[in-house]
Amino acid sequence: MTLKERITFLTTPEEVDAFLSAHPRAAIFKAGTCHKTSETFREIEPLLEARSGLPLAVIRVVEARPASNRVAEVTGIPHESPQLLLFKEGRPVFDRDNWDITAEAVGGALDENYPGSS
């Protein structure tokens, strides 16, 4: 299954709660409509593709602001877009936004928080 086939799109606060409850180890990518979103996702896509066991949710912020706000509410991490959050044991362990979403930063966080995971 490809990464794009594995993506769960979250549109409501209830979907955020259900996703995080079902997947204590997961990634959430908040996508805006600017070029930063597509460029940052393209940079980290191979890393996420290689972690086939890591559930990935995407929130299209313009269309699903309440879902994005729910992530900020439950994590205490202010909303940004684009933004990548990694969760371990149901808690956020990594947060990067905008141009700080790099292959180097994300790769290191994946290796640190999910060693040996694919």
Outline where the language-model segments fall.
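N-terminal leader/targeting and pre-domain segments
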Residues: 1-24, 114-118
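Residues at alpha-helix caps and immediate loop-helix transition turns in enzyme cores, especially N-
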Residues: 39-41, 67, 98
